[in-house]
Amino acid sequence: EYHVTPNEGKNCLHSGLHGFDKTVFDMGFEGDDTLVLTAASPDGTDGFPGNAELEVRYSLAGAGLMIQYTLTTDAPTVANITNHSYFNLNGHASGSVLGHRLSLAAPAYLETDAGSIPTGRKIAVAGTPMDFTEEKTIGRDINADYPALKQCSGYDHCYVIADSGLRHTAWLTGPETGIRMETLTTQPGVQLYTSNFLKSATACKD
């Protein structure tokens, strides 16, 4: 039995107080188009078993960006490595993204409990404000009187992606620039988060 460090109420968010999100990575390059980042997490860090080694590769491929994660450990453990970037396709300091047009290849999303922890139950998006199977602006339904949205003060939900293998998951367009971003993944879900708890004065980089 293992006890991990709680840092958000009773929950352990982002692997606790010493997760990879708080780690300074070693950096290297492969050729002119690939950045390789590596870091280690010793056995027992914040209660997690196993010596874990993480490699993250950022590669430019034509007009696209590929992110690959590889984590190895010497003991059974829990790992869910992801990317926590934010995108405003209208450009830096261009205001809200609520006018961005979004579509998701997701017929369902995961229900969460009062602590925003998934219960494992899939809820169909059809007929609800959670439905992005047809393109719409992010802001169209974000303030709808719907329990899942009110609980999170917006979108902060794992959408269940149809099919398997490497496939398209999301299409996002900035209305002012016309810039369109498409995302692909091999994973079963994608998290839609509308920065509900970030302060407006949060500093950003160009």
Please report, for each region that a protein language model flagged, where it lies by residue:
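An exposed, glycine/acidic-rich loop-and-rim segment of catalytic or binding clefts
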Residues: 1-206
